Amino acid sequence: MNVQACSRCGYGVYPAEKISCIDQTWHKACFHCEVCKMMLSVNNFVSHQKKPYCHAHNPKNNTFTSVYHTPLNLTLKKSVAAMGGIDGKEDGEPFKSVLHWDMKSKAGAGAASRLMNERDYWPGYAEGNTWCPGALPDPEIVRMVEARQSLGEGYTEDREQQQGKGSFPAMITPAYQRAKAANQLASQVQYKRGHDERVSTFTPVADTPELLRAKAGGQLQNDVRYTEDGGQQRGKGSFPAMITPAYQIAKRATELASDVRYHQQYHREMKGMASPVGAEGGMTKDSVDRCGQVYSEECDEPRGKGSFPAMITPAYQNAKKANELVSDIKYRQDFHKMKGAAHFHSLAAQDNLVLKRAQSVSKLVSEVEYKKGLENSKGHSINYCETPQFRNVSKISKFTSDNKYKENYQTQLRGHYDGVGMDRRMLHALKVGSLASNVAYKADYKHDVVDYNYLATATPFYQTTMRLVPLKDVNYRQNIDRMKFSSVTNTPQIVQAKINAQQLSHVNYRADYERNKLNYTLPQDAPQLLKAKANAELFSEVKYKEGWQKTKGKGFEMKLDAMSLLAAKASGELASSVKYKEEYEKMKGRALGATDSKLLHSLQVAKMSSEVEYKKGFEESKTHFNLPMDMVNLRHAKKAQALASDLDYRKKLHDYTVLPEDMKTQWAKKAYGLQSELQYKADLAWMRGVGWLTEGSLNLEQAKKAGQLISEKNYRQRVDELKFTSVADSSQMEHAKKSQGLQNAVAYKAGNEQSVHQYTISKDEPLFLRARANAAQLSETLYKSSWEKQKAKGFELRLDSLAFLTAKAKRDLASEVKYKEDYERSRGKLIGAKSAQGDSQMSHSLQMSKLQSDLEYKKGFEDTRSQCHISLDMVHLVHARQAQHLATDVGYRTASHCFTALPTDMKVEWAKKAYGLQSDNQYRADMKWMKGTGWVATGSLHVEQAKKAGELISEKKYRQHPDALKFTSIKDTPEMVQARISYTQAVDRLYREQGENVKHHYTQTADLPEVLLAKLNAMNISETRYKESWSRLRDGGYKLRLDALPFQAAKASSEVISDYKYKEAFERMKGQMLGSRSLEDDLSLAHSVHATSLQSDVNYKKGFEHAKAHFHLPLDMVTLVHAKKAQTLASDQDYRHPLPQHTVLAEDLRLSCAKKAHKLQSENLYRSDLNFMRGVPCVVPGTLEIEGRKKASELISESKYRQHPGSFKYTAVTDTPNLLHAKYSNQITNERLYKAAGEDARHQYTMTLGLPEFIRAKTNAANLSEAKYKEAWHNLRAQGYKLTIDALPFQAARASGDIASDFLYRHEFVKERGQLIGVRNVSDDPRLLHCLRMGQLQSENQYRKEAASSQAQCHLPMDMMYLVHARKAQALASDHDYRTQCHEFTALPEDLKMAWAKKAHALQSEFRYKADLMGMKGTGWLALQSPQIESAKKAGDLISETKYRKKPDSIKFTTVVDSPDLIHAKESYMHCNERLYRLGDAASLHRYTPIPDHPDFTRARMNAMHLSDKVYRNAWEQSRAGGYDFRLDAIPFQTARVSRDIASDFRYKEAFLRDRGLQIGYRSISDDPRTTHFLRVGRLQSDNEYRKAFAKGRSQFHSRADQPGFLQAKRSQQLASDVLYRQPLPQHTSDPEQLGLKHARKAHQLQSDVKYKSDLNLTRGVGWTPPGSYKVEMARRAAELANRRGPGIRGASVEPEAAAALGDHQSRGVNPDASEILHIHKKKTLLM
């Protein structure tokens, strides 16, 4: 901002106080009259010589010489009359009672004025020092003491001398003395007369008070000493103004000048002591002379001193004020009325900044005053409108009006000069005359500039005081309970939640789809459509199976260096635990550029380890946790819970429209009848594996890794105790995923079925012909026959051939030394970023350094979070995008970028190769679909890279042995989340509540299929039929083998119950959730940052009132909607809510039930209504649900984990969910309440006897009959049964014993206290909402009061994305919908899927059902030997703690006969079998006669020579004997040196230190992040500065929606979730015939993952172009044509490279062998 200087004071002028007049810039306070100093405005000033004047003092009008009736002349006239003897005495007598003019005070004022004489002080001071060295005290103390004496006792002594003489002539009256002094002052001659004589009359006497005071005044007047003291005192400000010497002098001078005190002293000491003897006139004259001399010196001194006049010294100001304060009360009143004109220095205490500041400092020093004002001042900030400067200006502006000025002049001054000589108005006129002096004005003005003309907040002592405020004991030690909470609406979590809500909005998704779906027009004769039709024929499953059967059993030759054998070796190395961990150590540390979760975790753990900090911030921070409900692990936990829990197994099925004879209906009847534990478990056993988490699966490993990373024990223990953890996103796991996707027969056939019916192509289409040619090329029969032909022919292979060169290049790529050499060369190339924020690694290092400083972290969080802006086209971002495209399979088929380069350019070739090598995923994917096997060749680039990366990030090599890791339980693991969800689902109240809600929300017709189904179900539930069937089953008996499903299930459950296996799986699962790019992307880190900001006590209380009204939370956010929905499901509140108004028939069943529900107002009646349903959701011990809870209890059992619970005392927390559940259970099971409620309900309810509910109630009553129960119990007891120690009831009792342990409960409660934190407020946490709602529901009044108001406040659109997804997931994961009616599809009657559906509906018996399942085995079931299962097993073995630690001798060998490895080994053995090879070759020996000079035969001989081991050894011996030159600068030597330097830790640190300071060259400090960081750290070292700036900067957060953190979060969300998978592509304006548009149309069809992978499988052989294919022949033909047209020999020498470039350009993604063969053809052509 351009600030101009004021024309008067020279200081900067800000817009708020700016006036532009007379071509100059002024302050409002500086724009005043040059004569009277009255403040002017732009409308009432007069300009003269570019200076402002008022109208009264306009120099053009006021050029007068003399006026007779001036106040001075009138005063002289009155004075002459006053000296007239009797009249003077008569006038003097009444005056004595009005005002006693104190001559001693006048002399004192003159003495005070003489104190400012600089020349008199220093000689006396020096003489005093020499006269009494060391005896003089501090000059300040001497001055104060002597001033008191000279103005006190000295005055009374002189007064007593005068009074004791007895005479009181008129000449010594105050009126006479004043008139005489005024006459002398008015005379210029008298003024200057006697100056030299007076100078010589003053002979310093060392011990006179006047001399000492003059010395002190001279010292104060000294310009050098004054400025020194001012500089020393400028920044202190922390001591009150009352203890300064200037304040003491002013106070003393005020007391001396006080009219009241003067009268008191006069009546006490002087009255009655007057003497008639005349006073000495010389003394009066001498006093007058002294006053004149001092006045002249006072006037002359400032004129020669320039910009620092003596009038601004404190001594002069005090003396001046003492002289001006002689007036009485009325004068002061008038003075206060006129003070706005020029009296800046005499404001009231409320408006005087100095006094106000002094009072404020005194209050701040006082702890009592500070504590009293703390609550009033904590929410305020400095405002310019509240500063004394603004108030002064506003008050002064009242007096600057010309109208009011003239009004006061007319009423108070004009015409009032006549009167007594001592008239107060005349005194006021004299006062104004003295104020009109320019010198005096400027002295006051300079003083005012110091006090008023800059912001009060910028004063040094104000800054010092404000810095001391947070350090007060009150602020520092106050209780955390007094702090209030305020929510910030612009936090990254809320912003991210808004963005997620917009992205997850089904309306937005459908809107974009509706806009885009009509933008495509596809003509019928489009080449893509024709090609699709041709592909439809190629995709025929019949032809596919026919070709597969033909080629399946023919076998093929495999050499020892074949890719399959190399892949087997590589897989052997992959399976090696040692090599895997070695690669893991190498790979560790590559994930640079992301936020360091471990470092942030260490900071978080340090905070959490403080018990005080934990207790202080728990209540505030527990509501700030924001967890998006569509996270991968949560969805996985939900699905796993739905599969693993028994809750929904026997739940009453929802109402679906199915036929009564439907197989699913029969199955539901059977499921409801399964009450025997054996039958129940047998039924569960065949479903084993459906919802079970495979040990070692990707999700488990990720969760285990995340737990390990945030484990406090792992972090704090010694480095040599860390265990080994597996990385879930390693190359092996990714490879297993890709292999599973490629080999998935279901996806392959599903995609084939869809595309079979969608394409039509003409037979003579070129694309169709080419597809036929490709089909011929892809034929395995033709391939093997051509391969046999080529193998028999042989070919020429020279040492400089492409194959050898390629092998060497691959060897160099696989060489670790060369890899490191290339890495070291390329390490510093990515430079050129504009700032450190542009470089991800530098930004990461800077962020780490900031995070390590707790002060920096707290201080700069709110200010710096809006200062990150990264341009999207920076190098590392572009590189990250390209790497992302290369690493994912999404952009695999996108068209390459368009480059303008010559085809023969070597850079183009190298760039193509580099692009293929840079992407690890693309490289492997390319290898996989080219090879067709899914294996990675040993020694390839990505294998070596993976090994190297594993070695680099190996925890074992980097730090320690993994044996010593201990177990730490994490509350938010999938197991714990699953346990919580299981608990929620197992609550009996919620189950019944949901049933009641469902029961009252539909209207049914009597003949609906649902009603018929309900009748059938009622028959199935019949107690009589149940007992009959049970008796028949029981009498028939059954056979139970050792391999029966119940036994197998028991074995599996025993493994599940194993605590050791759980902890082993937990250790593997910890730490997977890593890799967030910034703090905002990581929930834990964002929560830690937010929690730390909340831990600031002062900061929290300071901004609460100001920020609590800024909270805005859209009600349609995903988390809120989900929380509302979850609350309605989880709470009991809506159970008795009045139902929303629906239009129903009067006889509707639901209306009757609703009436009954509204009558249930008594709690007893309410519970009695629940009691009739007792036993319906009864859980049988030993079920999956109970076992899961047992397992959860054992997992969190502290006694098993750490210590015995007997040493802990019991303290119950009454409001926990468990206790609340126990209370409710106790109330529900209360027999007295049950019967009382039953009596009440019996007289208030009438029900139809034929209702299914009534029949079910009768059935339940029969089931709950005590007599029948005891009878059945006695029958069972008489039969007896076998109960072993390891039986499930015993296991359940043990688990329940652990659950009932109060110590475990207390311990888990304490451990869990700080875990559930991070939601932004209570409304975001469903559990907290549930607890609050439970508290409200316990009050019957609260319940009835809130019932009507809250019933209509929940709106949840049923088509929201996550709800739809949850429904689909539920339908897929549960057995619930298995028998539901299939959705309606439009399919042909002869469609294969239609026939299959009919067949599935016909399966009604369990035998046929399971037999049909056996027929479908492999379709939706994971095969035991599938790559996914095998990779999971292998991963489990690799990270198995048991297998890792035990000796190899103890490992038993079990081989799987049909494993891929053995099958592959068998086939390899058959291929490598010499007998079989020769046997097959013998038949062809007699059928072929080669020409001896045939080129192929000749080439075979040459190849035999090349491949001969004997010839090879002879050549080696010859070359070795010949020797060769190997210099010191050879590449191997250089490579060895570089690799040694790379491996040297010292060299690494040395390079790091050299590299640290190279980022120089910034234009300014603001461009250098480190310098800016240091400056900011310097400011932030002051805690006061941080807290003061916090409130100002808290609302300045601005986060761009397109910043990389948000974009990365969006992309990560898109990759991790299935929500946006099918989102339509953005609209582009492109040619309809453009290849990209055609590809986009094709991509829009690939909406499911199955179709996508099936499409990949369909095209597995398309991109692989074997020799002699259409592309190769076309390239060869083009090369030959170009060769013919080439210019002679030169063209021939250039053409091979061009042809190679052309071929490579046309066949990017083609098998490199085709390119090599093409080059061989070209070389042979050239040689010929």
UniProtKB/Swiss-Prot annotation:
Transmembrane segments annotated in the record for this chain: none
Pfam name, any one: LIM
InterPro entries reported in the protein's UniProt record: NEBU/NEBL, Nebulin-like, Nebulin_repeat, Znf_LIM
GO molecular function: actin binding; actin filament binding; metal ion binding; muscle alpha-actinin binding; vinculin binding
Modification Phosphoserine occurs at: 1078
Organism classification: Eukaryota, Metazoa, Chordata, Craniata, Vertebrata
The organism of origin for this protein: Mus musculus
Recorded GO CC terms: fascia adherens; muscle tendon junction; myofibril; Z disc
Protein name: Nebulin-related-anchoring protein
